[in-house]
Amino acid sequence: MKFLKIAFGTVAALITIAVGISYSWTFTPLGRLEYPAAIVAKLSEWDRAPVELTPESRAVANARVRRFMPKGIDLARIEDREIVANGVHIPIRIYWPNTEDDGPLPIYLDIHGGGWWMGNGFAIEAPTTHLAQNASVIIVSVDYRLSPEHPYPAALDDCYAALEWIHANAEELGADPERIGIGGGSAGGNLAAALALRARDQGGPKIRFQFLLIPATDLVNSDWPSYREAGDRYMLKVSSLSTMFESYVPDPEDRHSPYVSPLLAKDLSGLPPALVITAHFDPLRDQGIAYANRLMAAGVPTQLHSEPGGLHGFLGSNKRRARVQKIAAEAVRQALHD
């Protein structure tokens, strides 16, 4: 009996110490992290293996992200289709919200993130279904081609093809071709910003609103304060960014293009109104803020929301993710509904 008491006491002490140590991880040089987010950040920091952009690592990364995401909500209808542009077959998934509105609905092109090398338009449906229902919009999610197998401009070309398809087929989908929104997170935010620029420059379909969530807007410069502050400590590692940039855009000269680095565009006037959301613990934070400020300076109506305490993608924080989803849904609804 005495041995059992000692054993239980030892185990309890070890658990208390472990909890205390892990709780200390919530205190960082950049401020407090929520406990689950702190665990995510610390586990990522301990993983010092360089990112490998292979099909095998892509499958592992996709599965890891799905584990942190809640399930989507039920919608009126979800349908898979495929569009063909310039001989390329591009899978899309269409989401119709539950609504009593008899008229045509706004339509929104969703562009997934994943560093241009992982993810797809269908695997993580919670944000998509939430936005479709709460903004009362039809959403088309595009499964664009990924690097390194398909470097720039493949992904952007696929997104542009999806935008043109949406405009041409909106009425058949029950949508209004004059009320098109676009958006995406991280690499998807980069592609959405680039898509808005390209549509403006090439006289493409008119976009009424763009939602840029934790976007990468500058694939050239690395002297951002948020790069130095975050380093490799907060889930998205600065050391991995250059690998992803080089995989997506192998030619360094192409990285100066506004369709790759929207922040480097000389003229941002005439772009659609925007919502830009950044995360405090994200190395991409400052370039997202800089892009929002440049949009405002160019006369583009722009909302900027900087989410305190959030990691890139808001992993480890359902509360922050829910708040961001609510802000996005309200902004999209207001912009696309007359």
State the predicted function of each range.
Residues 1-16:
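N-terminal Sec-pathway targeting helices
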Residues 18-60, 64-338:
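Alpha/beta-hydrolase superfamily serine-hydrolase fold, recognizing
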